[in-house]
């Protein structure tokens, strides 16, 4: 009996559900399968089936808590020169900030790396990355600031700026009022915009600050589901992307130590009419305190289970905590200790733009 051939639509449906690593190995099977790597619809659909993983920068190496092990971002860069670096994700790509020097842009699954250099003013503090969502091509832009002395008492202020990666030029952004800056590793990119948690000292309210790269405007995006506390007693808040188009907010009380997970009811768009829903509340003695962490904190939610990566309170070693209901399991990460940078990453088939691509690794 002659073997039948699957309809092309069914083949695509099967292929988009495979892990990116498997897809990379299959691209040489035929031209049609290889062409999928340039199909924006296929790339977007496969991203919807990707499983989150932690990407951890420890010492001079990068690791993933998942199915692959990752090496140094760019083997041509001397790692010992870069003591202060951070890693973040945006639109299926990884971005590693090399303090005062530039940023690498990277897709480990496609083995593509690019380098974005601050050629003019290297005293630039990286906050996060985004793009103009209204344009068909992603023109990546880096949001950050310069420290500036602006009186005879040498008080330090911030001069906000955008580094446009395509033109490799800085553009200063002047605004009469800026939300409070977030801490290290606390900026989240969604739909091209940048978001962070902030606190208003006057009203004692927690809110989301945002920066829209299409309008180049910063704003108070929405209030957060937090009680009002005086300064010094605020909850610990950690923002992340939920289901690809929403937000999740981890909230740990400084007073009770209870941990809550809140999620937005609807997809995030330009409207600031945001409704928050309580997804889960954890009251577990073994759950870590997230106050005074020396490393980044990241997490994702899968099947009503919280998977969290942070320092262990007793040893300072990096750990994965898996919490659900009244149960919590701790898994120690070997060779990862105090001060590591990390992020949650969805493996994707998004290519590094050709203008930045420096090498294949």
From Swiss-Prot:
InterPro entries in alphabetical order: A_thaliana_F-box (IPR050233), F-box-assoc_dom_typ1 (IPR006527), F-box-assoc_interact_dom (IPR017451), F-box-like_dom_sf (IPR036047), F-box_dom (IPR001810)
Q: Which domain of life is it from?
A: Eukaryota
- All copies of the F-box domain together span 1-46
PANTHER family, A to Z: F-BOX ASSOCIATED UBIQUITINATION EFFECTOR FAMILY PROTEIN-RELATED (PTHR47993:SF385), OS09G0372900 PROTEIN-RELATED (PTHR47993)
Q: What's the protein called, per UniProt? A: Putative F-box protein At3g18340
